[in-house]
């Protein structure tokens, strides 16, 4: 697709790591699927933008599209195993759980850790874990420590930097309180105390950075970057398939085809729209025809190739959902900051229809070039007939090795986020 091939890798470069944001909320917030892409296909963009109260009166989070494996729950072990396999093949070293809203999803995390420990014990270099915290950061770190990091049996699942498990968190109580209470009125009583010495010594901390709010610092870790070329936070760059740096994703999908009286352009930073998957800096335009090809994502990878940071952080793997609201001040247009449709969304996970596996292949291709030297020579396929009655020496000239991930076949028999959805795959 798009003429892409994943290059053959040679020696690994030193000081190269790739991480990816990972969401655990599927099945926790809604038992009903509302898919914006399907609504647009059936009734058009105008209906999706202006009739939110009709098709989603309860205000449940929307899926912008359908994942390849269906509307799965985050505790579906078949999905966890597929994710770990795909991310391993793409060269991802760690996943960062989105705990930015204080929720740590301990049951889902334990199941993921068990799968990681099992597969790594069998020799498969699947990604390890960390957490990305933000709101009530100190409280969230304590929860993650109590639930996961105080359990030695999960050690093999922890991603470490400088010999300590990585934790993205604000550990200054005053700053944590200011950010939390300033952004969330319902948490006005939040009054964090310093983390204990044991926890402070246990983790390697980096500070979560909020674009448009926090300055660029060497110890910062942005979940998304609203600048291009991407900022360098010490040894780290953050990339995303799309970026809502100017406006909500739902508003950006309107483009410039709607008159100003329908939506105040003042809230769009001078009338600009956000960078979608098909945005190109050559013409400074979003182009739906380029969305599946990932022109915006590739532009950022080209920055990485020039800057050569030690860590590349990707936002993200499997968000899929976004909260929706409407505001009479803005013409009751559907408001969704984080995602709306294929063009204006940030997921890299495989999609049913749409871009299919294009963003996984694009990620794998760029990660290989970033992390590995590209050899001048490589092992070629050998085509030969094997006599099952002859000896093992017949295999000596066959150098390539292919392994199935995991020592056992694992089927699927699970419900989706909507109880009526059932998914089955034989072992």
Placement of each model-derived feature along the sequence:
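Glycan-processing catalytic domains of CAZymes
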Residues: 1-387
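Order/disorder boundary and secretion-linked terminal/linker segments
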Residues: 368-427
């Amino acid at each position: 697709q798009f003429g892409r091939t994943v290059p053959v890798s040679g020696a690994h470069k030193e000081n190269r790591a790739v991480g990816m944001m990972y969401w655990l909320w599927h099945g926790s917030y809604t038992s009903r699927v509302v898919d914006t892409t399907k609504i647009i296909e059936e009734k058009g963009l105008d209906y999706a933008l202006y009739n939110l109260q009709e098709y989603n009166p309860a205000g449940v989070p929307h899926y912008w599209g359908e994942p390849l494996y269906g509307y799965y729950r985050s505790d579906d072990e078949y999905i966890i195993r597929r994710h770990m396999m795909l991310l391993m093949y793409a060269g991802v070293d760690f996943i960062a759980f989105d705990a930015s809203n204080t929720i740590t999803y301990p049951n889902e995390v334990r199941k993921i850790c068990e799968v990681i420990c099992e597969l790594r014990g069998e020799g498969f270099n699947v990604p390890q874990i960390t957490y990305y915290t933000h709101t009530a950061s100190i409280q969230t770190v304590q929860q993650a420590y109590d639930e996961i990091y105080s359990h030695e049996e999960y050690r093999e699942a922890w991603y470490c930097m400088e010999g300590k498990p990585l934790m993205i968190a604000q550990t200054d109580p005053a700053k944590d309180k200011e950010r939390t209470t300033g952004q969330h009125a319902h948490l006005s009583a939040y009054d964090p105390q310093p983390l204990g010495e044991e926890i402070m010594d246990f983790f390697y901390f980096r500070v979560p950075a909020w674009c448009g709010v926090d300055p660029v610092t060497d110890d910062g870790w942005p979940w998304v970057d609203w600048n291009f070329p991407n900022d360098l936070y010490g040894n780290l760059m953050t990339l995303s398939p799309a970026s809502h740096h100017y406006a909500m994703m739902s508003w950006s999908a309107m483009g410039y085809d709607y008159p100003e009286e329908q939506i105040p352009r003042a809230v769009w930073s001078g009338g600009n729209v956000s960078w979608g998957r098909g945005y190109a800096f050559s013409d400074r335009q979003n182009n739906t025809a380029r969305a599946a090809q990932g022109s915006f994502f590739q532009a950022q990878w080209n920055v990485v190739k020039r800057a050569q940071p030690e860590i590349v952080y990707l936002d993200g793997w499997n968000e899929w959902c976004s909260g929706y609201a409407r505001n009479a001040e803005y013409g009751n247009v559907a408001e969704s900051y984080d995602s709306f449709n294929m063009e204006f969304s940030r997921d890299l996970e495989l999609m049913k229809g749409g871009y299919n596996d294009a963003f996984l292949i694009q990620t794998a291709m760029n990660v290989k070039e970033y992390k590995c030297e590209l050899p001048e020579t490589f092992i070629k396929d050998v085509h030969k007939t094997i006599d099952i009655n002859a000896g093992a020496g017949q295999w000596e000239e066959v150098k390539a090795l292919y392994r199935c991930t995991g020592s056992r076949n694992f089927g699927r028999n699970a419900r989706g986020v909507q109880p009526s959805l059932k998914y089955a795959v034989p072992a």
